[in-house]
Amino acid sequence: MLTIENVNQFYGQSHILWDLSLEVREGTCGCLLGRNGVGKTTLLKCITGMLPIKEGQIKLNGRDISKISTEARARAGIGYVPQGREIFPQLTVEENLKISLGARDDKITRVPDHIYELFPVLLDMRHRRGGDLSGGQQQQLAIGRALVLDPKVLLLDEPTEGIQPNIVRDIGNVIRKLNKELGLTVLLVEQKLPFARKVADDFFIMEKGHTQASGAIAELSDDLVQKYLSV
């Protein structure tokens, strides 16, 4: 379970997150929704430790992780796929995946088989350079690299952005499998409502750095969409 309690965060003098609280239930997918600039990516970076919080707590299965380092949070079970994927273009697919092995406590030296089972294209292309992959394949690589950590919580920042429809479908299927079969908790930022409705169990709508509405994804009404998400 991932719990955010009364988190405040600033960029200089700008107050970005205001007493923000939410809870992602264990083994479910929660979706952060909101217009651009409301603090969704900032929240994910706060959870990873890339950005410090001024006040509040971030808890993983009841443990406060808000004061430990980014590396320690990764070891504790926080996996993260940022916008832009940030793979290493000169490294092979397999080398990109192996980068995450160093953060595992069991010190294994090979990519776990289930990563290739989730993303068969990565097995077929494991000796190709990351920069030679399509955008969709790079997104699969980025998710696979995060999963090599064997995380308890996976954070995804707009995983469908700029991705071809068939791979969007595959990514959605993987998220549901991670939830339902492997019990992984997922928190994703998403702009595409059809995708959010397909993969998410719960939603959290953000506006001005605060959670304005939340609930089961089936409760995401047209009125809420019009009020908080329409451009």
Q: What residue spans do the PLM features occupy?
A:
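The feature captures the beta-strand-to-loop junction immediately N-terminal to the Walker
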Residues: 33-35
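Helix-to-loop junction immediately C-terminal to a conserved catalytic motif
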Residues: 48
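ABC ATPase NBD coupling module
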Residues: 52, 64-85, 108, 112, ...
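ABC ATPase C-loop
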Residues: 146-147
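Catalytic Walker B motif of ABC-type/P-loop ATPase nucleotide-binding domains
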Residues: 154-158
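Helical segment within the ABC ATPase nucleotide-binding domain
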Residues: 169-183
